[in-house]
Amino acid sequence: MSKLEALQVFLLEKLNEKNEIPNTSHLEFDGKKLGPQEAQSAILSLAAKNMIEFSRHEIEIYNLTAEGENICANGSHEAKVYNEICASMSGLNIGELKKKLGNSAGIGQGRAFKLGWIKKDGDKLVKNTDSITDETPKVLSEIKEHGTISDSKTLTDLKKRKLVERNKIMYFSLRKGPNFSLQIEKLNTDLTAEMITSRSWESAKFKSYNFAAEGIPPAGGCLHPLMKVREEFRKFFFELGFEEMPTNNFVESGFWNFDALFVPQQHSARDAQDTFFLKVPASTDKLPDPEYVARVKATHENGGETKGIGYRAPFSLEETRKLVLRTHTTAVSANMLYKLAQNGFHPAKYFSIDRVFRNETVDATHLAEFHQVEGVICDRNITLGDLIGFLEVFFGKMNVKNLRFKPAYNPYTEPSLEVFSYHEKLGKWVEVGNSGMFRPEMLEPMGLPKDVRCLGFGLSLERPTMIKYGVADIRQLIGPKVNLDLIEASPAVRLDKEE
């Protein structure tokens, strides 16, 4: 008989004697206390046959540390200090006390002062009371016997002094099951060809199926948390009647990435420390319609046909031909708006969610590449109020409420607004997006009618993902430090539901 089978028989016999076992940790098996791990295997096996029923319990107990054991046996440090001072008759200075008690002197002296057992007289320590009661060893002895005491304040003090430590103990209570018996019947787990041939299966007993048991996790691929949140955003946009823009073009010319957006060619964002420039090929010969390029050039230099004055600086075609890794998906939005103007304007709503690249220092909240969520609304005679109203609807779908809007600056939007929401857990206002109305200097050279207004807004995909999945460092979400277990275990997400 194996040890497991012997333990099963032992438990059944104990149950037969008493009908119930309230606490398995009080049992002794094979000459020692029955531990929870050892008992669990036998209990689960018997419960699967409905021979017993059980409940699992967990309690907290306190054990003495090595120092606690020493004090329990030999008395507290403060009592030793008091006794040495009493024995000296005239008191002791600190140096003499350390020679007699060693490390106990420093620990015990402070406690003895606190309890009012000793006082200072000149450079000596003298007793302050004729007698003391050393309660600490008594309390520790009670904890050693019972695992705890009723006085929570004293228990907290002992924990702070590192005389006791808390442990969790698991135990089981057992009752007889519907199939209780002292004989353990072996149940079949498989229906074999031999059993079918001999018809022995008709009288055989089989182990019941456990339909609540977890199956083996599928070995297939898993969606990254970013992709799950991305699909939630796409759903919101489609519900609001938006059309998705094609964004499968990571490389853009300086024209679409900057110039078409009315970003000055002298802007710091166009420096190598902020933008990734391609080496091979370093530039492109493919620019849009020369007339459009000429209108953009004139708008930059002197305002062109718009009412503005431009940047009053030369416009370099060499600069506009440079190839970069796109720094924002607004380059795609500009291309779509240009096509909208060429094909005959009609009210439109576009969105995109894709990767962009910035030459930034990588840290816990910044990466050199990340995902931008962007939306554009074009119609006649729409205003900043329409933008604010739409943003309240859009962020409301993500359960982000209580918005505030702060004036901001963007080269291609005016007016521009930063969007803030009050974060209940952080207890402060946090930025959740950026927005604005595209400038006439961007729209009119495209050929859009003068009464057409375009509203734009954007946010990162990573920030809401980090909040929803409780990720503090963005490098744990994207890059070589990503834990594959995080991806496999990440649940489905609903941005419109509170956690």
UniProtKB/Swiss-Prot annotation:
| First-listed, main subcellular location of the protein, grouped into a coarse class | cytoplasm
Instruction: Report the subcellular localization.
Output: Cytoplasm
- What Pfam families does this protein map onto? PheRS_DBD3 (PF18553), tRNA-synt_2d (PF01409)
Binding positions for Mg(2+) per the UniProt entry: 414
Entry's EC annotation: 6.1.1.20
- Keyword Protein biosynthesis present in the record's keywords: the answer is yes
Alphabetized CDD domains for the sequence: PheRS_alpha_core (cd00496)
Q: Gene3D superfamilies, from UniProt?
A: 1.10.10.2320, 1.10.10.2330, 3.30.1370.240, Bira Bifunctional Protein, Domain 2
Cofactor or coenzyme needed: Mg(2+)
* GO CC terms in record: cytoplasm; cytosol; phenylalanine-tRNA ligase complex
Q: Which GO terms describe its molecular function?
A: ATP binding; magnesium ion binding; phenylalanine-tRNA ligase activity; tRNA binding
The residues the record assigns to binding L-phenylalanine are 330, 372-374, 412, 438
Q: Which reaction(s) does the protein catalyse, per the Swiss-Prot or TrEMBL entry?
A: tRNA(Phe) + L-phenylalanine + ATP = L-phenylalanyl-tRNA(Phe) + AMP + diphosphate + H(+)
User: What are the GO BP annotations of this UniProt entry?
Assistant: cytoplasmic translation; phenylalanyl-tRNA aminoacylation
What family is this protein classified in? Belongs to the class-II aminoacyl-tRNA synthetase family. Phe-tRNA synthetase alpha subunit type 2 subfamily.
Q: Read off the NCBIfam families from this record.
A: pheS, PRK04172.1
Quaternary structure annotation from Swiss-Prot or TrEMBL: Tetramer of two alpha and two beta subunits.
Q: What is this protein called?
A: Phenylalanine--tRNA ligase alpha subunit
Q: Gene encoding this chain?
A: frs2
